[in-house]
Amino acid sequence: TESLVLSPAPAKPKRA
């Protein structure tokens, strides 16, 4: 899951 946060998706934080 941390990988998703590091991924280029500042406008779409899947972890949030």
Swiss-Prot record:
GO BP term, pick one: chromosome condensation
Localization per Swiss-Prot or TrEMBL: Nucleus; Chromosome
Record-level Gene Ontology MF annotations: DNA binding
Keyword Nucleus: yes
Tissue: Erythroid cells.
Gene Ontology cellular component terms for the protein in this record: chromosome; nucleus
Keyword DNA-binding: yes
Key words of the record: Chromosome, DNA condensation, DNA-binding, Nucleus
Function text: Histone H5 performs the same function as H1, being necessary for the condensation of nucleosome chains into higher order structures, and replaces histone H1 in certain cells.
Family indicated by similarity: Belongs to the histone H1/H5 family.
Entry protein name: Histone H5
